[in-house]
């Protein structure tokens, strides 16, 4: 009898402790609001040719290229990507080209989305969009977009609030070296960083291959001009 009671109590505890999707979404909204107003006390500043950014103490860096960096937050790989096309478009011309990940996210149906604005290190307004898309099983594609940057990760839904908090904190510290971007990319007929981004994205998580396949199909249907 005692054993049965113990089992019943355990079931009740486990049932009571389960996290509902509604609760997760509430936690995500709270995390984004907290990150938008948090003091920017950063551990280290990292300077690249095209941009500068700061990392919180708990976030690490795995590898990087000219336009992308893989960060590590809560034992999860996070891709931080500089949107070269947006930088060039603001300076020279409006382009029909769209960063592949941005285009894919825009066409998909999110299970969570929040659009708002915060302030960056220079106290300038920084609009952002946080989106979560279902991938497969318990995995979701978590993304945060600003004017010039796109952060993305593939992880369990329950990690979304923690990852988006770090993404937004870092996004608030980013500064683009526009002159360097123009010097490197404005005279190129083809910008190969899109392919480079997808190659790095493939290293994020086991489910990233499925997302890349979905992006490739989407791009092949004419949604993105390469």
Can you annotate each of these PLM segments?
Residues 46-103:
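Secretory pathway targeting signatures of secreted, lumenal, and periplasmic proteins
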Residues 18-21:
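Bacterial signal peptide processing site
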Residues 151-226:
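Surface-exposed amphipathic alpha-helical segments
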Residues 2-10:
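Sec-dependent signal peptide recognition
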Residues 105-157, 161, 198-206, 210-217:
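Signature of long, low-cysteine stretches enriched in small and polar/charged residues
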Residues 25-47:
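Post-signal peptide N-terminal segment of mature Sec-exported envelope proteins
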Residues 13-16:
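C-terminal motif of bacterial Sec signal peptides marking the signal peptidase cleavage site
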Residues 63, 105-109, 174-178:
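Sec/Tat-exported extracytoplasmic proteins
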């Amino acid at each position: 009898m005692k054993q049965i009671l113990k089992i019943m109590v355990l079931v009740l505890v486990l049932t009571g402790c389960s996290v509902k999707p509604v609760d997760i979404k509430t936690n995500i909204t709270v995390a984004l609001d907290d990150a938008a107003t948090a003091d920017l006390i950063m551990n280290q500043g990292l300077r690249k040719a095209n941009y500068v950014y700061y990392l919180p103490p708990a976030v690490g860096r795995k590898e990087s290229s000219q336009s992308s960096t893989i960060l590590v937050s809560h034992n999860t790989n996070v891709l931080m990507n500089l949107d070269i096309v947006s930088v060039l478009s603001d300076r020279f011309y409006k382009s029909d080209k769209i960063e592949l990940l941005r285009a894919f996210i825009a066409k998909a149906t999110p299970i969570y989305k929040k659009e708002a604005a915060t302030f960056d290190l220079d106290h300038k307004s920084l609009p952002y969009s946080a989106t979560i898309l279902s991938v497969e099983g318990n995995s979701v594609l978590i993304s945060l977009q600003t004017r010039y940057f796109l952060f993305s990760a593939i992880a369990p839904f329950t990690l979304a609030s923690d990852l988006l908090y770090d993404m937004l904190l870092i996004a608030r510290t980013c500064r683009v070296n526009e002159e360097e971007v123009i010097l490197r990319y404005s005279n190129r007929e083809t910008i190969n960083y899109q392919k480079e981004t997808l190659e790095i994205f493939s290293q994020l998580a086991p489910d990233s291959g499925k997302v890349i396949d979905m992006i490739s199909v989407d791009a092949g249907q004419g949604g993105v001009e390469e």
